[in-house]
Amino acid sequence: MKIICYSKCSTCKSVLKIMDEKGLKYEIRDIKEENPTKKEIKKWHEATDYDIKRFFNTSGMIYRQENLKDKLDGMSLDEKYEKLATDGMLVKRPILLLDDGQILVGPDVRKYVEAL
């Protein structure tokens, strides 16, 4: 499995701690160092039943500065993928990519690893 997170995010830190305590093997990717591409975001979104808004870090500074709360409804799905790909800090985290192709985002990641 692969986890995409931000090293300073408290949620990411706690999920990684749980994974380590359970002895889970994983690859880690820092979302700030290696921004997700539009193609990746599209693929992840299509692999879930989440609304694309679920992929936005709505409590993040960039989301608020750009007033995306009011802009998202007027954007096409493709424009939303493009916007998410502009900065990893816009993307909700952590994102867990499971070996079977399943994708989990945000609080669902914690629930999943706690249940293992």
Segments from the language model and where they lie:
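Local sequence-structure signature of Cys/Sec-based thiol-disulfide redox active-site neighborhoods
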Residues: 1-21, 26-31
